[in-house]
Amino acid sequence: MKRKIMACILAAALGITGVSFPAAAKTVSVGKNVKNITVNVKNPLDELRAQEAAMQQQEELEEEENMPEQDLDPLVLDNDGSEDIQTADGSISGELPADFSEGTENGDNGSEELQLQQENGNVENVAEPDNNKADEGAGQAQTDFTDDANAAGDFSAGDASDGELGTYQTVTLEVEEGQDITAPWNTLFLELKDQATDENPCKIIIPPGNYELTGTLCMYSNMYLYARDANITKTSTTKHLILRLGNTKDSEGGYDGYRNIVIDGGTWDYNYQCVENKDAPGGFVGFCIGHATNVTIKNATFLNNLKSHFLEFGGVKNAKITGCTFSGYYKNYVEGGQECIQIDCCTDESNVFPQYRPYDGTTCEDFVIDGNVFEDVFTGLGTHSMMSGKTYKRITVTNNTFHNVKKRCIRFMNYEDSTAENNTMVNVGNGVDISSVSSNTHQTPGYDDGPDMLKNRNLRVAGNYISLARTTSIGGIAWICSGIKVSGYNMKKDGAVLPKKIYPVKGVTVEDNQISGYGNGISMSLTDTDTVTDNQVTMKKTSSYSNFGIYAQDSRGSVISRNTVSGTANTGIYLSGSVYAAGSEQRNLVEQNTVSGAGGDGIYLQSVNTSSTAQKNTVKSAAGSGIRVNAGKNNNVLGNTCLSNKNHGVKIEYVVGGVRVKSNRVTSNAKSGILLWKSKVSEVSGNRAEKNRGNGVYAYASVIPVMKKNTFCENGKVQAVYVKSCKGWTGINRPSCRVVTSRSTAISGTASGSQTVIAYARRSGKQTKLGVSSVNKKKQYVIKIKKQKKNTALKLVSKDKYGNTVTVNTVVK
């Protein structure tokens, strides 16, 4: 009940139920200048906490939906590990004899005889061609089926792309159009099991046609399945595996159970529509591959999944999935996050990967997932369970297309040395999700410690195109879309496997991605030395929650540079600090970014207590301030350009020390150029504030040791520098002057806060100094000049003892 109440509260907070939820706002009044510091925008930190709480609810709904124990795998060994084979009708038969001529399908007394054959009935040894040309003979004679672009690499003993193949034994499975393929397949493959060797692997051809499937298919080492133009449709009503390696759960373990497997082609329709009790707990995995080395699945189409994975790998090394299509899932099932391609670990804890023994914790390494299509599915590929002390290594996801993916496209959990690059994702709930660990962590046998929280993950997300859907809720709980999400994990109390501590994500590079649509662009939390560069983030404002362009929450050593961000409902680029980042010597850098049209502040550093710098950024047309620093310390705002923002150009508030505001240009902002509010700053120098509607600098109750060499021009308020309750400082007004005519021989007026006033004349693009005057105790000045022609442009520049200057322009009458 508490969870349901919390879900309702969160839904209301995020606007999911249509109930209005007041935005966090701050309105501060100080005398006549109240309108300079009145702010009404959503508090980014509160907004992010609400979003994270909602997504935590989603995580709790995503429970693994593995096959129920009562649904045995037809034609696979029973759960007791016996040596017998279970037939499709559930009966148990003894071991198959050497003479397979009496084998029948589905337990019938049919007369079909299964045999090895070439075209004329014998096995043929076919030499693998030396060239690398693509197979163009899918419709030719059977002897042509051995040609393949990557065949030499598919059975390599080392990397998936290396090695040479000897000869194939080419075999054609004898089946008729519309026939149940289960028993003929398992009979033939079992006979070939001992004949297929590393030197002479077997290539089995399924002829083009349409076939049914009523049980689990078994495949063994050194086998190449060629199934192009074959359509295999599951017609059984139970939930069972479609295909596995071996006919028993037991193997040698590690990566040594099976080797050299190729599945080439076929349309595999899992046909969830035929399954009884679809809404009961559990789905069924399609192809389940475990404890294996050198596995290739290519050119295949997988359709209509029921609450689980199309392909599942556990403890596999050197795998390639290329040129495949995954489409269709049971849409009534919204709680889970089962991936089309699941990269998993060998453990039976929580029913994670029960199909292969031993449960030794072996993870996956050296995967290439390239050129596939994922369409109208719940989740694309990745991992949602892990082993303590082990990682998934060298997973490469490139050149894939994701379209209409409800949740995540790519999920890297506990990965290292891995890449997601040049993928296209359109109308998706999340592009790339990277996380260090999760509560779904299992104990590795013989390992008693937790994950290595100092490990450099060396992960790269680059060159992807991501267009986010307008999804606001899934299963009645708010869903927050994100283009790229990088998350550490805060284990707040000791668990069964994970000890209490913070597990950051270290060493992630996010670069050259294009992100658009509804949701957050790039988000990071509890990260360490991660880099976000050269990305284009073009968001649309959402009605249900307030989205961000790029944010780094409680992170150390983040570099956010050369990105373009626009259109967010909240802050364009946001950094916030907390427990993990506090006191870190690693510097956060926000540099050379362009932010426009943000619904909140352009760049916002909130409660950041580690050394952080925002420099050389351009921020324009934000609904809040251009650059804002709230609380925290040791932050720098250097060399930025802030123009046409609806609040201040630069806003500094409640900081406790070590903040420098230097060499910024703040222009045409709706309020003051620079606001200093109840802050301890180190330096305000070298800034240029012009054409702002308020003051050049507005300072209230702040400590300012140095304020020098700032330039103010054509700001709306008389006070170029407005100071109140700032010890040791007085305001600086712009110089005023009496009317200057063509007969005038002097320019006179007042210049409060300045020491001198200089007059210049501008003619034909050239500037000539006319004279200078000191300012007396009555704040008056008189500059003697020669008579000037009518309509001559004059410029008056006042300067105080710290080199701060105020410029006004006038014309000779």
Segments predicted by a language model, with ranges:
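Sec-dependent signal peptide cleavage junction
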Residues: 16-35
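Right-handed parallel beta-helix/beta-solenoid
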Residues: 30, 37-39, 144-187
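N-terminal extracellular ligand-recognition/capping segment immediately after the signal peptide
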Residues: 177-186, 200-240, 268, 302
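Short glycine/acidic-rich loop motifs that flank beta-strands on beta-rich extracellular proteins
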Residues: 212-216, 234-240, 272-278, 284-285, ...
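Right-handed parallel beta-helix
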Residues: 255-404, 409
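Ser/Thr-rich low-complexity repeats and stalk/linker segments
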Residues: 729-813
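Short, T/G/N/S-enriched strand-turn elements that build extracellular solenoid repeat scaffolds
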Residues: 185-196, 212-221, 252-253, 310, ...
